[in-house]
Swiss-Prot record:
Gene3D superfamilies: 1.10.1410.40, 3.30.160.20, Beta Polymerase, domain 2
Ranges of compositional bias, category Basic and acidic residues: 72-81, 373-384
Chain intervals for the UniProt region annotation (Disordered): 52-85, 364-403, 466-502, 627-650, 708-797
One MF annotation (Gene Ontology) recorded for this entry: mRNA 3'-UTR AU-rich region binding
Native organism: Xenopus laevis (African clawed frog)
Post-translational modification remark: Phosphorylated. Phosphorylation affects nuclear translocation. Methylated by protein arginine N-methyltransferase 1 (prmt1b) in the RGG-rich domain. Methylation decreases DNA-binding and thereby decreases transcription of the gata2 gene, but does not regulate dsRNA binding or subcellular localization.
UniProt entry tagged with the keyword Phosphoprotein: yes
Cited PROSITE patterns: DS_RBD, DZF
Annotated protein name in UniProt: Interleukin enhancer-binding factor 3-A
Sequence ranges assigned to domain DRBM in this UniProt record: 399-468, 521-587
Amino acid sequence: MRPMRIFLNDDRHVMAKHSVVYPTQEELEAVQNMVSHTERALKAVSDWIDQQEKDCSGEQEQPMAEETETTEEGKDSEMKTGENPTRTLRGVMRVGLVAKGLLLKGDLDLELVLLCRDKPTISLLKRVADNLVLQFETVSEDKYEVIQNIREALIVVKSTKEPPLTLNIRLTSPLVREEMEKLSAGETLTVSDPPDVLDRHKCLAALASLRHAKWFQARANGLKSCVIVIRVLRDLCTRVPTWEPLRGWPLELLCEKAIGTANRPMGAGEALRRVLECLSSGILMPDGSGLYDPCEKDASDALEHLERQQREDITQSAQHALRLAAFGQLHKVLGMDPLPSKMPKKTKVETPVIDYTVQIPPSTTYAMPPLKRPIEEDGDDKSPSKKKKKIQKKDEKSEPPQVMNALMRLNQLKPGLQYKLISQTGPVHAPVFTMSVEVDDKTFEASGPSKKTAKLHVAVKVLQDMGLPTGMEEKEEGTDESEQKPVVQTPAQPDDSAEVDSAALDQAESAKQQGPILTKHGKNPVMELNEKRRGLKYELISETGGSHDKRFVMEVEVDGVKFQGSGSNKKVAKAYAALSALEKLFPDYTMYTEAPKKKRPPMMPRGGPKFAGKHNQGFGMMYSEVPPPQAMRGRGRGGMNRGRGRGRGGFGGGYMNSGGYGGGYGGNYNYQTSATAGYSQFYSNGGASGNAGGGGAGTGGYSSYYQGDSYSAPTPPKPFVNKKPPPPQQQQQQQPPPQHASNPPKPSYNQGYQGHQGGQQQQQQQQQQQTYNQNQYSNYGPPQKQKGGYNQGAQGAGSGGSYNYSNSYTGGTAPLGTAVERVQEGEAAALTQRQALVTTQAHTPAMVEPAVLRRTKVTRSLITIKVPPDRTTVALQIITSSLREELGVTAGIQNTT
């Protein structure tokens, strides 16, 4: 698995630093020569001591009978730990940096452990050291200096030439550990130690180093990047004094635990950052978890030698190093200069590949018993899984390489490219991704239904720009039919196996490049074929290829004809077989079209029809000369044309079971409480469009849909003139009625704006129909020439749409013919610069806006009201004393200011 791209820069810096601190080939050769010479000399010393002991004991055995002659490399005289239990010197083993392969440039101290049969003594150490000088002269021409260090229980061997290497040979025995375990268990020792025995703690430390070397070879050497990170951190411990206490076994154990617990192999940069994260977490702190030593029977902390201040200093330094690495300054942690972002192209030079894991080959003089039995190549008990793997490897070598797409080709040519997501458009079910990549200071962009497909298209563009093959040529040269059609095999033509194989290879290659296999209708071929022929069975005909590039051939029989398809898996092969059957048996199959969905009527735009191209003059809120619309759904629970209300009335479900928010086509705001909600008559006003009420007046005025008193916005009358209005006969002569005036008017409780031509005649109709207008206040409008009565809405065309707020009194209608006649004979005047309306009725208070009562004269037959234009709104309810008996109500004045 390749490292993550976000750590590529860190990997480059870590590997560059590692190449600097790694020892040169000359240094490694010098270490190898000194170690091998010492091992061969110790083997000769062991033979000499064993021969002397046999001569002294009188035994007549030939100690060398089972051994072959020693060659120059010392490969034939191997002494293993378990094979020579009677020898005084049982074997020599590499430990420390030599065994673990952690040598750095400038490391001059090497270690070996010499195992003894009995507890090592001072006399044994001197005998070995004295004879070792003689054996060096016979083994090698190089001169070595041998020094005895009894206090440390070791023999020091120094080289006399450059580099001045030092090799420490530690003497120990497994009996020292066994006696320690017995003492800890409370047992008494029956055998007394010799008086000149070496220091027990030094011997135990040598045994521990031997266990550490075995554990490291088994756990850390095979872990990717672990040895490299340890070498880099060993250099850090040398350069930074804060890290010095961590050097050695604790550092090795910590790196193995941090890197080995990852869920995937990591590069050198990512592995180093993971170790820094582990240290930064506070694992070294006194209250931390500590570090368990796996090479000890009893639970022990490998960090117990660290002091509290040292733990805090190392943790703080690791946190600082982690911050630097996070901000792209890992070179400061490594103590090196930053590398350029783009490395210059270098000519390829054949250099030997260096194995950074193994620095020095294993010893051949004293061979350690292997941790596991070697695989017997010719044995009958060879694992069958091993055989299977070898067979698969042979098959993989013999098969052609896997077909590469454009993205794979580009990654081979330009590794480490960064693909960026530019945009994501389209709906959720069909998104379109746009990816870009920068190659050689050029930016390429492409789109696709997924990020992966978009990246593939970008790679195709890059390869085309470079003039390199993209892997799509075969698909472009051939037609779609020749690519996707598998060979059809009928029972009468069974000799098409070669053609099937060639088509199978083409299908497999095109499948990898084209993505999912779909029919011309965008469906899965197997699903579409199953819709036409149920119960089809797909059979596997053949399976070829290696484990990494399988080829499957599937066959299906449809209507007595067999169709085959091939692919890299059974699913793809089935799809191509079904696709072949569809194209052969159903070539003219039309695409399935869904049933047309029920279209909703167009919603009325906000703001009403004032945005329409054609409407009545003035501030109207209704369309002119427009037919009634279809039923429109709103947000309420009403009828077909739902409004905001909850009524279940007819079209234009209203606020209180009738009326609606924009109930009419013109969009009047009707808030009515009438229980007689019904279908509004659009053409009840003699064909005039607008919100005409059911059975409305004979003129084309704007009024409410429903029966009841309407709320109109008439234009204000002219200033006060003490002149009586002309009789109805004269008005009829002066202004002829409209075309629809001849129709007999229907009785209605509804009255809105009157037409400009039928104003006077409608005044008479109002007197006959006993129309009740309530709560009328006007909107802005031009002044009219004709005066309107108190019981009429302001006459004239040109005023805008009306806001109808009706309450629809349906009970207790008193005969007001006398009252209406008396009111119409009165005189009224209003001085105002804004719209004003004065109305007197039996049940509705008159609204005056803006006006205040100046003087009220109550007479038996006349009511006079004068209002100034600069006062606030007042509401009057005037009932003359002469009408009290007729109306049965009381008179009063109500001021709402």
